[in-house]
């Protein structure tokens, strides 16, 4: 969708909602850009689980999600994080609406092929009609990373993956994956650009590690599936690391 920008907010969403962030959103809207936000909430989910004495377990960067964890995840994402984000926009008189998989089956999903993860899923389809209708009315959409499968099970979805699937389905002009670092680092230097076919090599070299591994895998998917520009950064106002499809020039 021409002129559409997707932004994935970090796990501590409030860290991203700075005045500079909102000024960039306002500038984009003035330039007739359509904005979609996908938010995480890992920090808040972990905090709530600990307060309820529910064990926190992760595997390969993904939260192991049993029934209790799933209920907490839904409660926090839909009932705490998303309203905080939409309220921040409303305070600035920016039209916004929060969406989740319960809204017309927005994000269809299926279980990941790992029974040890529990109710963790992957997006199989993004129903773009509702998103596009709202964007046509200049309403920013804020989407929670939860999916529903054919049996109507709710599934926890990695927020980076969800953002990349949404951006790809919309054929977005740009995707910004906001995180807590200003880009992908090699030593102390930010790498300006990474081609998708360089990612595995950088991973083996130890340049890419930890939570950056699944983030780059998601970014590569978006770059290879029609998203015009994919950037990993800590702010909409910094250049970060651009993920480019195929082989980098030079």
Curated annotation (Swiss-Prot):
EC category: transferase
Q: Where in the cell is it found?
A: Cytoplasm
State where substrate binds: 41-42, 63, 156
The molecular function terms in GO held by this entry are:
acetylglutamate kinase activity; ATP binding
The disulfide bridges present are: none
Kindly list the GO CC terms recorded for this protein: cytoplasm
One Pfam family for this entry, by name? AA_kinase
Q: In which pathway does it act?
A: Amino-acid biosynthesis; L-arginine biosynthesis; N(2)-acetyl-L-ornithine from L-glutamate: step 2/4
- Site described as Transition state stabilizer, located at 8, 215
Keywords for this protein? Amino-acid biosynthesis, Arginine biosynthesis, ATP-binding, Cytoplasm, Kinase, Nucleotide-binding, Transferase
The protein's annotated catalytic reaction(s) are: N-acetyl-L-glutamate + ATP = N-acetyl-L-glutamyl 5-phosphate + ADP
Q: Under which EC number(s) is this enzyme classified?
A: 2.7.2.8
Is Ribosomal protein given among the entry's keywords?
Answer: no
Q: A biological process (GO) annotation for this entry?
A: arginine biosynthetic process via ornithine
Where does it mainly reside? cytoplasm
Query: According to its UniProt entry, what is the function of this protein?
Result: Catalyzes the ATP-dependent phosphorylation of N-acetyl-L-glutamate.
What family classification does the UniProt entry report for this protein? Belongs to the acetylglutamate kinase family. ArgB subfamily.
UniProt xrefs under PANTHER family: N-ACETYLGLUTAMATE SYNTHASE, N-ACETYLGLUTAMATE SYNTHASE, MITOCHONDRIAL
UniProt-recorded name of the protein: Acetylglutamate kinase
Q: Which organism is it from?
A: Listeria monocytogenes serotype 4b (strain CLIP80459)
Q: Tell me the gene name.
A: argB
């Amino acid at each position: 969708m021409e002129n559409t920008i997707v932004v994935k907010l970090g796990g501590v969403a409030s860290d991203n909602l700075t005045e500079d962030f909102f000024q960039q959103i306002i500038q984009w809207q003035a330039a007739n850009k359509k904005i979609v936000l996908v938010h995480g909430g890992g920090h808040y989910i972990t905090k709530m689980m600990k307060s309820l004495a529910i064990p926190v377990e992760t595997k390969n960067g993904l939260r192991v999600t049993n029934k209790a964890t799933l209920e907490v995840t839904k409660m926090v994402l839909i009932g705490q994080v998303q309203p905080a984000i939409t309220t921040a926009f409303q305070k600035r008189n920016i039209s916004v609406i929060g969406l989740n998989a319960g809204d017309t089956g927005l994000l269809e999903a299926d279980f990941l092929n790992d029974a040890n993860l529990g109710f963790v899923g992957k997006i199989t389809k993004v129903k773009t009609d509702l998103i596009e209708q709202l964007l046509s009315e200049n309403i920013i959409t804020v989407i929670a990373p939860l999916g529903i499968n054919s049996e109507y099970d709710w599934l926890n979805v990695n927020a980076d993956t969800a953002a990349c699937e949404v951006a790809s389905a919309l054929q977005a002009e740009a995707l910004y994956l906001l995180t807590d670092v200003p880009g992908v680092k090699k030593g102390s230097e930010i790498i300006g650009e990474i081609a998708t076919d360089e990612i595995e090599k950088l991973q083996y070299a130890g340049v890419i590690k930890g939570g950056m591994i699944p983030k780059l895998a998601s970014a590569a998917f978006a770059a290879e599936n029609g998203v015009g520009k994919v950037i990993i950064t800590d702010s909409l106002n910094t250049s970060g690391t651009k993920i480019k499809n195929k082989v980098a020039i030079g």
